[in-house]
Curated annotation (Swiss-Prot):
<comment type="pathway">
    <text>Energy metabolism; oxidative phosphorylation.</text>
</comment>
<keyword id="KW-0472">Membrane</keyword>
<dbReference type="GO" id="GO:0006123">
    <property type="term" value="P:mitochondrial electron transport, cytochrome c to oxygen"/>
</dbReference>
<dbReference type="InterPro" id="IPR004202">
    <property type="entry name" value="COX7C/Cox8"/>
</dbReference>
<dbReference type="InterPro" id="IPR036636">
    <property type="entry name" value="COX7C/Cox8_sf"/>
</dbReference>
<dbReference type="GO" id="GO:0005743">
    <property type="term" value="C:mitochondrial inner membrane"/>
</dbReference>
<comment type="function">
    <text>Component of the cytochrome c oxidase, the last enzyme in the mitochondrial electron transport chain which drives oxidative phosphorylation. The respiratory chain contains 3 multisubunit complexes succinate dehydrogenase (complex II, CII), ubiquinol-cytochrome c oxidoreductase (cytochrome b-c1 complex, complex III, CIII) and cytochrome c oxidase (complex IV, CIV), that cooperate to transfer electrons derived from NADH and succinate to molecular oxygen, creating an electrochemical gradient over the inner membrane that drives transmembrane transport and the ATP synthase.</text>
</comment>
<keyword id="KW-0496">Mitochondrion</keyword>
<dbReference type="GO" id="GO:0016491">
    <property type="term" value="F:oxidoreductase activity"/>
</dbReference>
<protein>
    <recommendedName>
        <fullName>Cytochrome c oxidase polypeptide VIIc</fullName>
    </recommendedName>
</protein>
<feature type="region of interest" description="Disordered">
    <location>
        <begin position="1"/>
        <end position="25"/>
    </location>
</feature>
<comment type="similarity">
    <text>Belongs to the cytochrome c oxidase VIIc family.</text>
</comment>
<dbReference type="Pfam" id="PF02935">
    <property type="entry name" value="COX7C"/>
</dbReference>
<dbReference type="GO" id="GO:0045277">
    <property type="term" value="C:respiratory chain complex IV"/>
</dbReference>
<keyword id="KW-0999">Mitochondrion inner membrane</keyword>
<comment type="subunit">
    <text>Component of the cytochrome c oxidase (complex IV, CIV), a multisubunit enzyme composed of 14 subunits. The complex is composed of a catalytic core of 3 subunits MT-CO1, MT-CO2 and MT-CO3, encoded in the mitochondrial DNA, and 11 supernumerary subunits COX4I, COX5A, COX5B, COX6A, COX6B, COX6C, COX7A, COX7B, COX7C, COX8 and NDUFA4, which are encoded in the nuclear genome.</text>
</comment>
<keyword id="KW-0560">Oxidoreductase</keyword>
Length: 25
């Protein structure tokens, strides 16, 4: 199930996480 998403979804997710951290700061 999760493998279906692939690393492609992980990449954007990481970027969003970084932006979230920056926004919080």
């Amino acid at each position: 199930s999760h493998y279906s998403e692939g690393p492609g979804q992980n990449l954007p997710f990481s970027v969003q996480n970084k932006x979230r951290l920056l926004g919080m700061m």
